[in-house]
From Swiss-Prot:
Belongs to the glucagon family. Gene3D superfamilies: 6.10.250.590. This is Vasoactive intestinal peptide. It comes from Scyliorhinus canicula. One of its GO terms (molecular function) is peptide hormone receptor binding. Keywords: Amidation, Hormone, Secreted.
Length: 28
């Protein structure tokens, strides 16, 4: 169970990082 929670949080963080990179590329 803890493994699934970790994966869920990790994927959420990955999405946030991807969004930040996308916004930075737009602003660059």
């Amino acid at each position: 169970h803890s493994d699934a929670v970790f994966t869920d949080n990790y994927s959420r963080i990955r999405k946030q990082m991807a969004v930040k990179k996308y916004i930075n590329s737009l602003l660059a």
